[in-house]
C-alpha cells in the first residue's frame, strides 16, 4: 500500500495515513472475525472474508486514482477483512496436536515460516514494483491471498462451537494481569515498525532506488 500510494499520489503523508487506516481497522476488527471463526468454524468465516478482502483490494486499486476518502475507507475495509493466517494456523496446530513437545515444535516451525514471509514479502514487492509497476505487488497479494485463504479453509475440519470454552471469562481480556502492559508494548512496537516502513520507502525513493525499498525493509 505504501508503494502504491506514494507512487501514484506522490505523497508519503497520504501513504502513511492509508496504511494507518488499514492497520488500525485490522487491529480493531480482527479479534471479532476470529471469534466468528471460533463460533461458526474456519471454513464458514474464512471463505467469505477472503472473497471480501480480494474485492476490497481491487477497490483500493480503483480508488487510488479517484476519491481520497474512498481510498481511506476501502483501505480500512481491506485491513478489517484481511485473514490473520498466523492465528488460524496456530489455532489449528493447538487443536490438532495433544503432545506438548510436538506442539512446541510445530509452533516454532510456524514462527519460522511467518517471519520468513515477513522478510521476503517487502523484498518481493519491491522486485515486482521494479518490473511491472506499483500496482503489481497488490495483484500478487490477491493471488497469494486467494491461494492461502481458500487452501486453509477447504482443509479445515472444525465446525465451530469453541467459543463455549470461554463462557466463564466474563471480565474481558484486559482484566487479565499484565495484558495492558503487553498491549502498550505492542502498540509502541507497531508505531516503530509502521513509521520506519514509511521512512525507509521515502528514503529509497529520494535516492532514486524505490524498487530497492522493499529489500531495505526486509533487511530492517
Located regions from the model:
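Transmembrane alpha-helix termini and helix-breaking/packing motifs in multi-pass membrane transporters
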Residues: 120-141
Amino acid at each position: 500500500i505504501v508503494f502504491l500510494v506514494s507512487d501514484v499520489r506522490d505523497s508519503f503523508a497520504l501513504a502513511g495515513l492509508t496504511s494507518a487506516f488499514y492497520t488500525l481497522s485490522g487491529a480493531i476488527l480482527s479479534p471479532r472475525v476470529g471469534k466468528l471463526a471460533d463460533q461458526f468454524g474456519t471454513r464458514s468465516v474464512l471463505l467469505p472474508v477472503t472473497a471480501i478482502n480480494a474485492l476490497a483490494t481491487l477497490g483500493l486499486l480503483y480508488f487510488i486514482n479517484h476519491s481520497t476518502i474512498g481510498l481511506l475507507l476501502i483501505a480500512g475495509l481491506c485491513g478489517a477483512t484481511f485473514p490473520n493466517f498466523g492465528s488460524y494456523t496456530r489455532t489449528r496446530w493447538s487443536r490438532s496436536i495433544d503432545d506438548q513437545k510436538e506442539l512446541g515444535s510445530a509452533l516454532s516451525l510456524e514462527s519460522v515460516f511467518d517471519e520468513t514471509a515477513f522478510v521476503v514479502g517487502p523484498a518481493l514487492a519491491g522486485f515486482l514494483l521494479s518490473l511491472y509497476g506499483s500496482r503489481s505487488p497488490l495483484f500478487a497479494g490477491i493471488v497469494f491471498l486467494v491461494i492461502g485463504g481458500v487452501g486453509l479453509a477447504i482443509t479445515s475440519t472444525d465446525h465451530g462451537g469453541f467459543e463455549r470454552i470461554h463462557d466463564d471469562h466474563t471480565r474481558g481480556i484486559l482484566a487479565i494481569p499484565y495484558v495492558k502492559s503487553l498491549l502498550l508494548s505492542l502498540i509502541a512496537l507497531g508505531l516503530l515498525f509502521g513509521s520506519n516502513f514509511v521512512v525507509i520507502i521515502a528514503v529509497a525513493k529520494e535516492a532514486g532506488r524505490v524498487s530497492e525499498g522493499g529489500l531495505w525493509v526486509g533487511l530492517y
